[in-house]
Swiss-Prot record:
Positions of disulphide bridges: none
Covalent lipidation (N-myristoyl glycine), chain numbering: 2
Family per record: Belongs to the small membrane AKAP family.
InterPro entries: Small_membr_AKAP
Lipid addition sites, S-palmitoyl cysteine: 3
Annotated protein name in UniProt: Small membrane A-kinase anchor protein
Domain of life: Eukaryota
Post-translational events: May be palmitoylated at Cys-3.
Entry's Gene Ontology cellular component terms: plasma membrane
Amino acid sequence: MGCMKSKETFPFPTTLDIDKLHESEEAFIPDDSSQYRTPSPGEQQQVQEVKKLPEPGAVIGALILEFADRLASEIVEDALQQWACENIQYYNIPYIESEGSDTTIN
């Protein structure tokens, strides 16, 4: 008998369904869509104007670099400030060197 849910159809497409989907899509694609059309002179001028604009990636890259540099400087300042505070707090505690691992504690 089994569970009722197991008898329901699988809600996700199977590989067979995907193949059928691709076949139906190919029927709607016209053949002349792959032909190349030469742009008119007005369109060529618009393309050249677009090429003259600065690349957004370069502007964004410069902003990210500036932000990263500023953030790194803040991190270094905070670390030095924290080290200075800790150093002042514990400066009078003497440093004890260990004599090595060959000594045993009795």
